[in-house]
């Protein structure tokens, strides 16, 4: 199949067609884009792991054993080791590798923490074939000899980012530091990238809602399908709207946690290097890697070899460098941006770009292949936005006049870009980890593990405090369940559930939560609040099991610290607020994704298996640990006559054929009533996240196991294991202690 360089049209169309209403959790998938793609899923049946390194491989240990100095020297040497099959522009691969690293990290989004550089996803579809990643397959091939040499000691994920750092350093640019430890995965991650049927051009903006001020669909960050950030030609490809371009830039960069200053610094810093490629008509652009012929060995976007050697290459379609010194760090970008007036032109590929009016020869750039030739510099509509938007312009003028300020801002913003999805600083490895703690790393002061006697006394006091099992379990869940396995943010460590904004989230039942936290603070003595919240939840679960005639022990790894407002960027935590939390039967409002699919999404972010998710839902319902419903208080989904006891009643009653379920008409298919099949009397109220465990064949199979006589202990053990997993999900201070 052929794909157009500008529009992203794939010949033959796409077999997946949404109806414009409710979408699936994952939207358009690789199979939709490439129906003939080799399917390996059958080999993963039975839980077979595709990781060839095996479960016992410790990547962090391997990384820390690398000859780091030698690796960086090899990367430095590569920068100017131009290869005939893909020659370096200006004799230097630095700009090419910066783009590779930028695009590896730049898929990160704050909405769900997915994307980013932490697992080397740029190697796989769809990212390896996005139009915005055009020709980066060659960058990865250039790196292969170094990856092969250092083997298990450097992951692709780490190599992408470190190579970007070395590229900047090799051209005189500023670098703040580097933290390694990104472990490769060996298959595409299941991420929602959008529902559009084509990439980049008109028709690829269904995520934008013009009637709502061009609001961008959550959790997406890129403005169009197949882009990392924005369309460089302008909003929807319209170059006549630089102000609208600024709006798009502000939105998309904010969704990857960047403010205006960081946005300007990153844009200017990235565009200080290299050039855009649009030397040929767009219709000569070859097929993307994932759809190419077998004998091309995973390479795509190919053209005539002689034209490649001559630099006649098309990627974005825009053609030309931004500065007269494309392989040297400096301030030429801002100098030229403000020195000249720019006129709208088109590249040989037909892309819109901006060219300086009457440029001086000294401000011309060398040709990428023949330094004796001079070519004009260019700006994109995105660059023009920095000049047109008042706030961006103010920052840009300051950077133009203060090189040191630009150096520092770019170095810090680049570091943030490349490390935002790595989680707490304790996960960073290697000799170049900066000592400075940064607020976006969500720092937590070190805690002290309490004595066994202090723990025992506290748990007894909690159970005598008058707080209910439900209240204690809900508080612990509210604290820990913010964790995201995607970017390793959130979790119980730090007890940020007592700080803004988390303390006021509707899902947390703020009034009840405040009462619980106040009492725990009164009782905790020398314990941190973070430990106290989790210990109180464990005490409640143990009591609930005893009250049901069982005995369980809920292990708690103590030693958590307490964060303060000073340690917390409250605004950055707002995307962690749950829109839906099926474990608590919470739904803010009906969404375009089915409620039960949002439960699956939440379980995925928590790193849970299907049995763990199932047991947690059933256990939380039995404990009465659900968010308060407008009409039914804390009873919706609580399918038991003995709430507060840890039983398998939820599954038993859900699967009872003596109950007939009906939709509550005014609920919009979100709420259901369970009636006695004979008498017609109401027995239960439930939601989609309850009934899915009876309606979905795979989830029903799980529920049946937990409902069976003789499997009560299996249910309890699975619930406790899953609960502990969630409570300890963010304890990198413990799991990484051996490396630091």
Swiss-Prot record:
Q: How does it assemble?
A: Homodimer or homotetramer.
Gene designation per UniProt: katG
Q: Name the catalytic site residues.
A: 103 (proton acceptor)
Which positions in this protein are listed as binding heme b?
Answer: 271
Please give the biological process terms from Gene Ontology that the record holds. cellular response to hydrogen peroxide; hydrogen peroxide catabolic process
Q: Cross-link Tryptophyl-tyrosyl-methioninium (Trp-Tyr) (with M-256): located at?
A: 102-229
Listed under catalytic activity are: H2O2 + AH2 = A + 2 H2O; 2 H2O2 = O2 + 2 H2O
- Record-level Gene Ontology MF annotations: catalase activity; heme binding; metal ion binding
Q: Describe the family membership recorded for this protein in Swiss-Prot or TrEMBL.
A: Belongs to the peroxidase family. Peroxidase/catalase subfamily.
| PTM notes | Formation of the three residue Trp-Tyr-Met cross-link is important for the catalase, but not the peroxidase activity of the enzyme.
Q: What is its EC number?
A: 1.11.1.21
Protein name as it appears in the record: Catalase-peroxidase
